[in-house]
Amino acid sequence: MASSVFLSSFSSSSSLQLCSSFHGEYLAPSRCFLGAPVTSSSLSLSGKKNSYSPRQFHVSAKKVSGLEEAIRIRKMRELETKSKVRRNPPLRRGRVSPRLLVPDHIPRPPYVESGVLPDISSEFQIPGPEGIAKMRAACELAARVLNYAGTLVKPSVTTNEIDKAVHDMIIEAGAYPSPLGYGGFPKSVCTSVNECMCHGIPDSRQLQSGDIINIDVTVYLDGYHGDTSRTFFCGEVDEGFKRLVKVTEECLERGIAVCKDGASFKKIGKRISEHAEKFGYNVVERFVGHGVGPVFHSEPLIYHYRNDEPGLMVEGQTFTIEPILTIGTTECVTWPDNWTTLTADGGVAAQFEHTILITRTGSEILTKC
């Protein structure tokens, strides 16, 4: 989950300014789904961990009121008549149904019981043989759930119905839907439609032919999280949108291709940026990949854009890569629910995500089904 991915932060580094065209700042529960630059490396050049103090994470973004949202929709409609780039109708909030229940016998991640939003763990997650077997099981389940969710994407289906189906499949497998209750997130999956970059909350809005939708699934099984997402087409989709989605998936593949024991993390962002720019798309810098395993979000933070951050991959590490590409701006606005994050200009966004395991000669995609 990204989205985060699902990580968030705001550091003093000048290399990243979250939603920098906006003046207001606010603290949001979604801070554990967004990312900002690492100010110190967790690994030395020898591959050993360096010690440092945990960073404080928060999001800096424009939180829109009801009036501002109405103005945004009006401006988007005006753009529809002037722009040569096709735009779907502006995304509108639907009704969010009550939180679904999870049977008592299913183990919960620690953050659910405590009710406290966890900090980003500074520990790299290297599970070991037994842990890797459990990671494979969690990731395989997440991949199967995501495949099933994709079959439900049709015109007139609501994202709330997709959430219910995903929730039921996860608990039937004896697992817990990791997003549910994370920092107050009210649903079991993220559904991000059209201009929604990430962290869309499932609601009563019906999908329409021409929509694209990212579904982000994370499951907690036997003490380990498996995290993956994919962007799907609903009905007849514009060729320009299809191209964006194709290139985004290719960016993920190219980022994964550079991963192996001893490789530099910054190679991921370089490879993704090169491919996106070749087609004229923009890479969102605010959302990062992250370590995943027994802990939902941890170091290393994976930047999907060009960067000079130090750090080397180590055999046995597990983390996500989850680039988001946009047709237009990468600036964002966040709805009052403190989660749903949209492109500021209404341009569509696409995202793909895998959890990978670093090996001596390359990497293994754990969420490939």
From Swiss-Prot:
Obligatory cofactor(s): Co(2+); Zn(2+); Mn(2+); Fe(2+)
Pfam families (alphabetical): Peptidase_M24
Transit peptide stretch: 1-61
Sequence positions that bind a divalent metal cation 1: D216, D227, E353
Positions bound to substrate: H199, H297
Tissues in which the protein is found: Ubiquitous. Preferentially expressed in green tissues.
KW Plastid (keyword) present: yes
Alphabetical list of CDD domains matching this protein: MetAP1
Primary location: plastid
PROSITE patterns named in the record: MAP_1
Keyword Transferase assigned: no
Top-tier EC class: hydrolase
EC number: 3.4.11.18
Keywords for this protein: Aminopeptidase, Chloroplast, Hydrolase, Metal-binding, Plastid, Protease, Transit peptide
Entry's Gene Ontology molecular function annotations: initiator methionyl aminopeptidase activity; metal ion binding; metalloaminopeptidase activity; mRNA binding
Gene Ontology terms describing biological process: N-terminal protein amino acid modification; proteolysis
Cellular location(s): Plastid, Chloroplast
Catalytic reaction equation(s): Release of N-terminal amino acids, preferentially methionine, from peptides and arylamides
Residues involved in a divalent metal cation 2 binding: D227, H290, E322, E353
Record note on cofactor: Binds 2 divalent metal cations per subunit. Has a high-affinity and a low affinity metal-binding site. The true nature of the physiological cofactor is under debate. The enzyme is active with cobalt, zinc, manganese or divalent iron ions. Most likely, methionine aminopeptidases function as mononuclear Fe(2+)-metalloproteases under physiological conditions, and the catalytically relevant metal-binding site has been assigned to the histidine-containing high-affinity site.
GO cellular component, one term: mitochondrion
Family of this protein: Belongs to the peptidase M24A family. Methionine aminopeptidase type 1 subfamily.
Reported function: Removes the N-terminal methionine from nascent proteins. The N-terminal methionine is often cleaved when the second residue in the primary sequence is small and uncharged (Met-Ala-, Cys, Gly, Pro, Ser, Thr, or Val).
Name this protein carries in UniProt: Methionine aminopeptidase 1B, chloroplastic
Gene: MAP1B
